[in-house]
Amino acid sequence: MNKITVLCVDDSALMRQIMREIINSHSDMEVVACAPDPLVARDLIKKHNPQVLTLDVEMPRMDGIDFLEKLMRLRPMPVVMISSLTAKGSEITLRALELGAVDFITKPQLGIREGMLAYSELIAEKIRTAAQAKLSVPIITPVSSAPLSFKPLLSSEKLIAVGASTGGTEAIKNLLQPLPVTSPALLITQHMPPGFTRSFAERLNKLSQITVKEAENGERILPGHAYIAPGDRHMELCRNGADYQVLITDAPAVNRHRPSVDVLFRSVAKFAGKNAVGVLLTGMGSDGAAGLLEMKQAGAYTLAQDEASCVVFGMPRAAIQMGAVDEVMDILKMSKRMLAKISSGQAVRI
């Protein structure tokens, strides 16, 4: 079996040593070289032709973002960013994902060695995912900057539930940007650690016509708003009389994820049923597939992103194989389609 070859770029000798230790402890991957900065990395990429690059966000001589931008333009390859758990770190990381990085790993703020070693399985999984990720997907911009037209719904019973993982930050951006302020509410679960979801929501809010925010426990769900599940918390739909409400919980991980897409979709199947549209986007694994099937069985219309526009086709593929998907389509056509489906049919009180 050929091992996944990895080049680690980090200005910290300790981090380079830890990453080498972690990666080499897995039988299906190995570190072929380490670089203290992007300028050294450039030569090592030519020499070793690694399959995956791990890249520190903040470095001297040339920072990770500048290097990533040049790399994705001149020599595209799968990149996993190593980021700090700070507001600045999360902003830079989201920019890196926009530029084409496949995923990111967060450095613990205290006890670097112990913290990183505890992430060993997660790091290995992200490297495996990166090695399989599709890089031919361009940085997508909506076909038209003009928002879609959508007649306001007479009922606030209608809503859209969205789930995503690897590659999802850009897919969600492309899903939300064309939506007009008259859109129904959206509940979105994107696999992401705490500290990043607020920055992600704020970034989307600046780019969208609708209001995008990190979800808060107990808040009323309103049309024209998108609610992002907070990192490391599950988000569910619930009811309070005639209104939909957000429920945020610390329940155990589902499918090894918190937030979990299945948790969101199952609650939407229960409380919204045929008033909902379910959307499953790019991501590794199968989280969301079973929940999407429950939504379909409850009468919801279900959509999955197609393989050609996915960074990783795992989650949509699992849902398709399970018979959970009504329609498979390109991410750029999905906004219009989900609005068309949500406006067809009468709202039914569940």
UniProtKB/Swiss-Prot annotation:
Keyword Oxidoreductase (UniProt): no
Organism listed in the record: Photorhabdus laumondii subsp. laumondii (strain DSM 15139 / CIP 105565 / TT01) (Photorhabdus luminescens subsp. laumondii)
Broad class of enzyme this protein falls into: hydrolase
Cellular compartment(s): Cytoplasm
Role noted for this protein: Involved in chemotaxis. Part of a chemotaxis signal transduction system that modulates chemotaxis in response to various stimuli. Catalyzes the demethylation of specific methylglutamate residues introduced into the chemoreceptors (methyl-accepting chemotaxis proteins or MCP) by CheR. Also mediates the irreversible deamidation of specific glutamine residues to glutamic acid.
PTM per Swiss-Prot/TrEMBL: Phosphorylated by CheA. Phosphorylation of the N-terminal regulatory domain activates the methylesterase activity.
Residues the record marks as active site: S165, H191, D287
Record-linked HAMAP family: CheB_chemtxs
EC annotation from Swiss-Prot or TrEMBL: 3.1.1.61, 3.5.1.44
N-terminal signal peptide: none
Sites of 4-aspartylphosphate modification: D56
Name of this protein: Protein-glutamate methylesterase/protein-glutamine glutaminase
GO molecular function, one term: protein-glutamine glutaminase activity
Notes concerning its domains: Contains a C-terminal catalytic domain, and an N-terminal region which modulates catalytic activity.
GO biological process, one term: chemotaxis
Gene encoding the protein: cheB
Catalyzed reactions per annotation: [protein]-L-glutamate 5-O-methyl ester + H2O = L-glutamyl-[protein] + methanol + H(+); L-glutaminyl-[protein] + H2O = L-glutamyl-[protein] + NH4(+)
Record NCBIfam families: PRK00742.1, PRK12555.1
Domain Response regulatory: from-to ranges: 5-122
PROSITE patterns xrefs: CHEB, RESPONSE_REGULATORY
Broad class of where this protein is predominantly found: cytoplasm
GO annotations of cellular component type: cytoplasm
Residue ranges annotated for the CheB-type methylesterase domain, each copy included: 153-345
SUPFAM superfamilies to which the protein is assigned, alphabetical: CheY-like, Methylesterase CheB, C-terminal domain
Family: Belongs to the CheB family.
InterPro entries: CheB-like, CheB_C, CheY-like_superfamily, Sig_transdc_resp-reg_Me-estase, Sig_transdc_resp-reg_receiver
